[in-house]
Curated annotation (Swiss-Prot):
Organism field: Bdellovibrio bacteriovorus (strain ATCC 15356 / DSM 50701 / NCIMB 9529 / HD100)
Residue span of region G1: 478-485
Compositionally biased region (Basic residues): 63-72
Record-stated family: Belongs to the TRAFAC class translation factor GTPase superfamily. Classic translation factor GTPase family. IF-2 subfamily.
Annotated region (G5), positions in chain: 615-617
HAMAP family registered for this protein in UniProt: IF_2_B
PROSITE patterns for this protein: G_TR_2, IF2
Ranges where the record places region G4: 579-582
Top-level division of the source organism's lineage: Bacteria
Protein name: Translation initiation factor IF-2
Primary location class: cytoplasm
Signal peptide: none
Amino acid sequence: MSNPKVFEFAKEIGMTPLALMDKIREWHLPVKSHMAELEPEVLEQIKIKLSGGEKSGDEAKPKKTAARKAAPKKAAVAAPVPEADASSAAAKTPVIRRKKDEVPAEAPKAKVVAKPEGEVEEAAAAPKTTRVVVKKPAVKAEAEEVEETPEVEAAAPVEEKAPVKAAVKEEAPAPVEKPEPVVAKEVPAAPVAAAPEAPAPQARKKEVVVGTSGVSSSATPASAPKRNIIGRMDLSRVQSQAPQRPQGERPAGGFTPRAGGEQRGASASFTGQRPGGFNRPAGGAPTRNIRTGFVAANQPPEPIVETGADRGGRDFDKRKRTFGPSAPAAGPAAAGRGAGEKEEVVVSFNAVEFRKREMVFQPKKKKGLLDRDAMKTQITTPSAHKRVVKVNNTMKLSDLAMEMGLKAPQLVRELMKQGVMANMNMDLDFDTIALIVPEFGWEAQNVFKTADEVAEQTAFGDLDAAPVTRPPVVTVMGHVDHGKTSLLDAIRNADVAKGEAGGITQHIGAYSVKIEDGSLITFLDTPGHEAFTAMRARGANATDIAIIVVAADDGMMPQTQEAINHAKAAGVPIIVAVNKIDKPGANPERIKQQLTELEIVPEEWGGSTIFCEVSALKKTGITELLEQIKLVAEVAELKANPKRSGTGLVIEAKMEKGKGPVATLLVKDGTVEVGQYIVAGTMKGRVRSLTNDRGERVQSAGPGIPVEVLGLEAVPAAGDKFDIVKDEVTATKVSELRKEQAEKAAATPAAKLSLDEVFAKVKAGDVKELAIVLKADVHGSLEAINGMLAKLSTPEVKARVIHSAVGGINEGDIVLANTAKGIVLGFNVRPDLGAQAKAKQMGVDVRTYSIVYELIDQMKAAMGGLLSPDIVEEVLGRAEVRNVFTVPKVGTIAGCFVIDGKVQRNASIRLLRENKIVYEGKIASLKRFKDDAKEVASGYECGIGIENYNDVKVGDQMEAFVKKEVARELEGGAN
C-alpha cells in the first residue's frame, strides 16, 4: 500500500491540511506540501508528537475541570475549566465573579458534559487563533509547553461562556477517554468557589470586555504567541465523531434550551440579557479556527467535515472579498467578546493575504484572482534614450513611421500641419524629420557622415601628440615677363645645398628650400594659376603665403592684377616682390601707387602688405625676402602633427607612360609613408613610391613637404584632398562616399546666377551685389566700361568687378566667375572653346557685346532689377451707397451709384464715411442688376459686396483702387 499523503492523513485525524502543515513546519519535518507523501518514519513521528501534545494538554484540562465538576473523569477533559481556575487562583478577577452569578450549580454538570477531544482541542486553539491573526507571531515548536499556562488563563473567560452557550445541550456524546491526567494537582476548590461568584449577565458583559483585556498579561493578544497549542487529539479515536450534538437543558444565564441541535440558529436561543458580540454562525455551520481550521470546542463534531462553501473554516464571498458571519466566531472566546474585540479581529485580517494562504488548496485558475490588475495590458513608452530616430541624411516617410512605431498617415497629417504636402514614399531630409518627430516625443539624430568625416575618424597614429612647427607653403605668382622664373632660380641658388640643386631639373611644381637657420620653406609653382583656382573653388587654401612678382620697369600688368585677385579670394597674406630694381628705368614707388588701386597698401604707407625690392639677376634682396616669408609664417603659427596619418592636397596630377597615374601631393598634416593606403579625391590606391623635388626616392614625407606619388588607380583632380587610411576596406568606403557625393552634386547642380535671373534672385533677398568678370580687347575700352559700371552702383545694389583684363575669355575667367557666383562680360572678345565648355559645365552666364552702350543699358536694367520695386496706388473710381440689402448666406450688399471713374471686380475697395477711412479690403461681388459684372462705369448703378465686412450704411462712399509695382531705375547712368 502506498504511503498516505498529508491531506489524506489530515482527513483521517480530523484536521485540515493547512493546520497539519503548520504543525509539520513547527516540528521541522521534511514535508514540503499537503500533496507530499508521508514516509513511515515521518508518519510515526507525527503520530507521536500529536499523541504527546494531547496528553500534555489533557493534564492541564483535568485540573480545572475537576475543580468545577463532581465527576473527575469528565473534568479532566474540559480544557476551558483549568483556564478559569488558573485565572482565579492568580487573582479573583471579575470574570470569576461573573461566572458565579451567571452559572448555577448545574454549570459544572454542563461542563462535565464536555465535548469530545476534537472539540476540546479546537476550543483551546480558538483563542490562540485570534491572537495569531492580530499579531502574526513567528511560532516556535519549543514554546508549546511554555504557553500552556497563558492559554489556560485566556481560556478562562471562554470557559465561562462556553457552558452558557452549549454545555446544557452537550451530554458527553463521546465520553472523555483521558481520565489518567492527575486531577488532584489542580482540583483546588478555588474554581468551584469561583463559579457561584460569577456576576449577573450584564456584569458579565462588561467583565467580558474587561476580562479579555485584564486577565494576566500573558493572556492578552500582545503576550507571547500561542499559536503553538493547536489542540489535543486522541489518536485512538481518530475516526470517532459525535453524530450530533445532544440536547439538554441550558443553565440560566442567557441561553434557553431548544430542540433540533444541528438546526440551531445563530441567535435562536439568544436572550435580551445576552451580551452583544460577534454574530453567531448558522446552525450546523461549524465555527472554525481561522488559523488552524479546527472546529471550536462549543460546536458539534460533525462540522469537522469541510463543505464546499466552508473551505478553510470561512464563509468567503469571492466577488466582494468579505468574510461571512462564521469567520468572527472562531471559538467560544470569540463568541463572548465585545463588539470592540470583534472589530479588532476583523480588521486584523487581510482578505488578499487570507486568499493567498488558502490558494494552496484551491484550483490553479483561482490564482489569477489575486493578479487580475497585474494581468491588465500596460501601455509602455520607450525610455528617452530609446526614442531617438537615426537618420542617414534622408529617410523615406514610411521607414520613419516604422522606426517610430506609428502609422504613416499620422506623419503625413503632421507634415500637412507644417505646410508640407507629403506621401508615404516621399524622401524627407533631416531638417524636416527633426521638425516633426518632437511632436511625437521622439528626437532625430543625423548619423550621416561625409567622406572627410569618415577619413578623419579612421585616422591613426598618435593623434594627441604635441604639434610642431611645419614649413610654410608659398606660391609665387605674377606676369611671365616679370622675372618669376628668375626669382625662383635665385631662391633655389640660395639653398644651403646649392651645389646639388643647381644642376638638377625640377621634376615637380613644388620644392623645398632650406634657409640659413636650417628651417624649410616650400614653394609652389603654379603657371597659369590653374591649380590654385581649382583649389579655391573647392574651398581649400593651397598655400599659406602668396608672393606677387611685379617688374619695376613694367609696372602692374593684367595678369598681375589677376594674381592679386586670386590671392585675395584665397584669403592668404600677400608679399609683393618688386623685381628688376637694378634696371635703369625701375620705379618702385610707381608700382606701390598702382597697387593701392587694388587695395594693396605698403606698410610704410600705413597698410599691411609687405613690399620687398629684389633683383633675380644680381641676386640682391633674396635673403630679405626669405626673412619676410619666415616672419609671416611665424605670425601665422603654422603647426602640424607629424606622428599621425598624413593628409593634404593634390597639387597636380597627370598620366605618364611607364608610370601610370602620377600625383604631386603637398602634405599639410601627418606623415605619408610607402606602403600605406591612400584616397585622393575619388581615387584610391596604395603608395608604391615617393619622390621628392630633387628626384630622390624617399620612404616618408612629413608636413609641408611636396612629394610625387605612384600607385593610384586613376588620375585625381588638381586641388582634391587626399587622406592616408588604415586599410583597403576604409579606402574603398571613403572613395565610394566621395563618388556618391559627387554624383548627387552633379544631379542637382547649384543654380548659377544669370543675367535673366538677377531680378528673381534679388527679390528673394539672396543677392544685393552683382559680381562681374570683365574682359575687353583694348585697355581703353576696359577703363571706360569699368568707369561706367562704377557709376551704376548705389547704396542698395552694387556692381563689383572682381576681375577685369585685356584679352579673350579663358577657362580661368569662367572658374573665377563660378567661384564668386557672378557673370562674365566680354567686349569685342569671344570665349575660346575650352572656356565655352567650362561655362556650360559650370553654368556660368557669359555675355559678349560690341557696343558699349548696349552693355551699359543691359547692366543698368539688371541692376535696377536688384532694387526693390516701388508700390504705387492708382484710384479707379468712386461710388456712393444709396441703399443697403441683406442677402441670406451672403451678407450685406450695398446698392451704389458710380459717381466717378469706374469700379472693377478685381480691385480693392476703401469704405469712406464722412471722408474717414472705415474699412479697406477687397470687392467680394460686383453685380449690375442680377448679372455679375467685371466693371461698372460712371453713371451706372451696381451692387457691391465687401469681403468679410457688412457694416455699410446709406451715404457711405466706396473708393476703388489698385496697387501696382513700379520698377525702380538707377539714378546713375552712362551719360
